[in-house]
Amino acid sequence: MAGFAEIGLSSWLVEQCRQLGLKQPTPVQLGCIPAILEGRDCLGCAKTGSGKTAAFVLPILQKLSEDPYGIFCLVLTPTRELAYQIAEQFRVLGKPLGLKDCIIVGGMDMVAQALELSRKPHVVIATPGRLADHLRSSNTFNMKKIQFLVMDEADRLLEQGCTDFTTDLETILAAVPARRQTLLFSATLTDTLKELQGLATNEPFFWEAQATVRTVEQLDQRYLLVPEKVKDAYLVHLVQTFQDQLEDCSIIIFTNTCKTCQILCMMLRKFNFPTVALHSMMKQKERFAALAKFKSSIYRILIATDVASRGLDIPTVQVVINHNTPGLPKIYIHRVGRTARAGRQGQAITLVTQYDIHLLHAIEEQIKQQLAELVVEEAEVLQILTQVNVVRRECEIKLEASHFDEKKEINKRKQMILEGKDPDLEAKRKAELAKIKQQNRRFKEKVGQTLRRQKAGSTVRRSRPPRSRPQEPAQAEAQD
């Protein structure tokens, strides 16, 4: 197998890789690094934990060493935590260069960030929203000379969903030069990325991992069928089991909402499990602190929303538990990708209720693998059921007393104001839209009822026997 030197990296970068314990390039690095060094645009799609970040960091650092200036490279990423992680890779691998980087994410002081940008760092790592804000409000820097534009977790950046980056990306793309190298990396190849691949006119290099399954082989994936009302008791039982069986067991539990995340964290702490939470309702400093405590093993359990499902590289994670079955298979792939990284073993357990069977089937179809059922002692779960339900209710009451929902609403309003929207006007629009949808639904129901009545009437008419025609008088006399 070719080494880092054989695929075109300079000796100083090969030495940096050796010091970090990177002995051989991974398949995605073998495929993409030579193409990037040749100056080609690149679209790389590989499993989580396969070394995608180093696949673009290494060639960018080599090109930067040949002609160092700022701003040389812009990296866009969907989450703040991932931005800091990418910056860490640039710093470690680019240490001999005296690399200057700048992280532009929400939740931090904009004035301090603007000052950093004005100093022309070599590499800017940013979330689209905050960088677009700077481009709209500041003229102390420009990006007209950047050589590389990187989109990490490109599927998330380009897909239109609950967080739509389209407007911000348009602002950013208008600010960068047309002549540049564009690198897109993702763990899931979505329809949007396929479309981009087909529309590209400059023949970009495309690399996709050839695998029969979409998750790594070292990952033991199972599901646990549980009734909705006793899900939390099964969760507590699972956590206790893993803590007993595995020494220094490190667990990430994924939930679907900030509120559930906070409640579960409070609940597990009541059961004396060392737990921290990570969700978008937390201040940025609190999020950093939670991640740092989990990474350093001060706390062994991290309960998180999908803000932690992408890109975060915490090699020691042994178990991922999905408290809810993900609604999209690609979310499942990113979640379970937080364990079994870089060749290590890992386990992923998904709690599936009676309402989630179709979601489980969709996941199995996407990853081209059937999940094995995990069997637990139901009697042991029933023993703690009442206690878990009581503790959960106590935590809910405590959270309600802290006005958690009100804070969430205030945060939403703040975000709207930052985006230049009127919160009251937006609420009015939503109410009007809901009213129109309701009217449309009623109209469709009436049309449906009318069509069904007409159909039923025509069926009755068709089912009646034809009436015999009365004989003409002349014919009747002739017969007599």
UniProtKB/Swiss-Prot annotation:
Residues the entry annotates as binding ATP: 46-53
InterPro entries referenced in this protein's UniProt entry, alphabetically: DEAD/DEAH_box_helicase_dom, DEAD_box_RNA_helicase, Helicase_ATP-bd, Helicase_C-like, P-loop_NTPase, RNA-helicase_DEAD-box_CS, RNA_helicase_DEAD_Q_motif
SUPFAM superfamilies the UniProt entry points to: P-loop containing nucleoside triphosphate hydrolases
GO biological process, one term: positive regulation of cell growth
Residue ranges of every copy of the Helicase C-terminal domain listed in the record: 218-382
Membrane-traversing stretches: none
Keyword Nucleotide-binding listed: yes
Protein name: Probable ATP-dependent RNA helicase DDX49
Classification of source organism: Eukaryota, Metazoa, Chordata, Craniata, Vertebrata
